[in-house]
Amino acid sequence: MRLCDRDIEAWLDEGRLSINPRPPVERINGATVDVRLGNKFRTFRGHTAAFIDLSGPKDEVSAALDRVMSDEIVLDEGEAFYLHPGELALAVTLESVTLPADLVGWLDGRSSLARLGLMVHVTAHRIDPGWSGCIVLEFYNSGKLPLALRPGMLIGALSFEPLSGPAVRPYNRREDAKYRNQQGAVASRIDKD
């Protein structure tokens, strides 16, 4: 059962759930909290790689990822990031979220953006118990026109679901947690699997 707005506010007030900066009450809806787009992005560079062998030797996968991913792009206030049709880009939420070991989060994109062809998360919309950091967004423009994305715009909504008990291996305590405490648009770390 997901938390309702009243319970989301109570968990925030009690410090069991942290969203920083804390959203105003107007952004806490029936069962969700609106999140905004941050100012950090990462894209695929122009490259000549025919493919990336995801199951190949880890050092080769790592080198291939380094060749095809851009450095982090940080926008100044008022600047726009343009996502063209058929392009994939990583971005980050403005808000940093910390979940306790007994709560899982879910990110959903906005329907109004999806109707323009913008996918906010390609597949990864679960936020694990024990997570702490900004949430990386996996943007894909499946529409026909470039989309201008500006930091601060509403980009999605988080919902929260209590677990039957605290996780024994929450994300923040796992040795293999590849994206622990991320604050930027961190590229794939599949080579760490």
Curated annotation (Swiss-Prot):
Family: Belongs to the dCTP deaminase family.
Enzyme Commission number(s) from the entry: 3.5.4.13
Quaternary context: Homotrimer.
Keywords assigned by UniProt, alphabetized: Hydrolase, Nucleotide metabolism, Nucleotide-binding
Phenotype upon gene inactivation: Mutant accumulates dCTP.
Catalytic activity: dCTP + H2O + H(+) = dUTP + NH4(+)
Matches recorded under PANTHER family: DCTP DEAMINASE (PTHR42680:SF3)
One GO cellular component, as annotated: protein-containing complex
Claim: Nucleotide-binding is one of the keywords in the record: yes
Pathway(s) per entry: Pyrimidine metabolism; dUMP biosynthesis; dUMP from dCTP (dUTP route): step 1/2
Protein name as catalogued: dCTP deaminase
Gene behind this protein: dcd
InterPro entries documented for this protein: dCTP_deaminase, dUTPase-like_sf, dUTPase_trimeric
Regulation of catalytic or functional activity: Inhibited by dTTP, which binds to the active site and stabilizes the inactive form of the enzyme. Inhibited by inorganic phosphate.
Species name: Escherichia coli (strain K12)
Alphabetized HAMAP family for the sequence: dCTP_deaminase
Purpose: Catalyzes the deamination of dCTP to dUTP.
